[in-house]
Amino acid sequence: MASETEPRPLGTFECQLCALSAPYSYVGQKPPDTQAVVLLEESYIMKDPFSSDKARFLVLGSRCSVCSRLVCVGPDCSLFYSKRVCLPCVQENMSAFPQEIQQDVEKRKSTSKKHSNRP
């Protein structure tokens, strides 16, 4: 049974690429119960279920800055390069990213293919 001081979920975050689904308790850049934390993007946040420390939280995801899809922070769904960008938008705009980001995306694709080929 949840205590009265625990934040109640505002809704359910669902990644539009991988269908990750989790209850979120805050949306914004300044998570509750933190003093010096300001996130670089408006994020969907949940309290860390593995910690009793109220200041600990998990970032679930945010909106893609290009297409506004709701995407998780997982490496197969999005990357953060000054703003959150979903991987389909990264692919469409690959030349707009620095060489290091392009190489990272290529590595992610090859790693993802290796995992999907396993029985």
Curated annotation (Swiss-Prot):
* PANTHER family registered for this protein in UniProt: CYSTEINE-RICH DPF MOTIF DOMAIN-CONTAINING PROTEIN 1 (PTHR31849:SF1), CYSTEINE-RICH PDF MOTIF DOMAIN-CONTAINING PROTEIN 1 (PTHR31849)
Q: Name one Pfam family in it.
A: C6_DPF
State the source organism's domain of life. Answer: Eukaryota
Give the family per the record.
Answer: Belongs to the CDPF1 family.
InterPro entries from the UniProt entry: CDPF1, CDPF1_dom
Identify the gene encoding this protein. Answer: Cdpf1
Protein's UniProt name: Cysteine-rich DPF motif domain-containing protein 1
Q: Tell me which positions the record assigns to the signal sequence.
A: none
